């Protein structure tokens, strides 16, 4: 993971298990973030539990998203969950997130391609996509997810 980021990867999307300071598989933690030397900051989409819990830790004991943002060779922006997220529910949110940014991500859904690509807006769109979706069907997990994923970064950052 670190090699891909150091090579200038534009976007890293991770979907597996996460904890406050790491991704599980492949394992990548705050320690590895500290070792990054890339000059082209990446965009991180972390569809994992707890990686965006800014209330975690004290002082230099950052959560995963915070470490990516604070490290000078880390990320330009991060989307991450502040608490435990739910499989399938977070997948549906991610589908909407990426369909907003790249309209052909889900070719049978929507047809309005837009000229501007704001990841902060994609965060809201992913939640709207989840709400209107008939799947997954457990509304309590959907309700929790609306307040779970946060965009950390410049709200008007555009992807070109």
Report each predicted region and the residues it spans.
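Catalytic-core segments of thiol-dependent peptidases
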Residues: 1-58
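Active-site-proximal C-terminal subdomain of hydrolase catalytic domains
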Residues: 52-160
């Amino acid at each position: 993971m670190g090699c891909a980021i150091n090579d200038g990867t534009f976007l890293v999307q991770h979907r597996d298990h996460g904890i406050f300071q790491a991704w599980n598989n492949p394992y990548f933690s705050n320690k590895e973030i500290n070792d990054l030397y890339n000059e082209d900051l990446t965009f991180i989409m972390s569809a994992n539990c707890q990686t965006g819990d800014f209330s975690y830790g004290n002082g230099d004991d950052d959560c995963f998203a915070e470490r990516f943002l604070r490290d000078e060779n880390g990320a330009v922006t991060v989307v991450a969950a502040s608490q435990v997220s739910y499989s399938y529910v977070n997948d549906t949110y991610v589908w909407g997130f990426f369909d907003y940014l790249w309209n052909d991500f889900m070719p049978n859904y929507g047809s309005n391609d837009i000229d501007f690509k704001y990841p902060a807006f994609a965060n809201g769109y992913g939640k709207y996509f989840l709400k209107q979706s008939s799947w997954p069907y457990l509304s309590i997990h959907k309700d929790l997810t609306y307040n779970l994923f946060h965009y950390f970064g410049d709200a008007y950052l555009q992807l070109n």
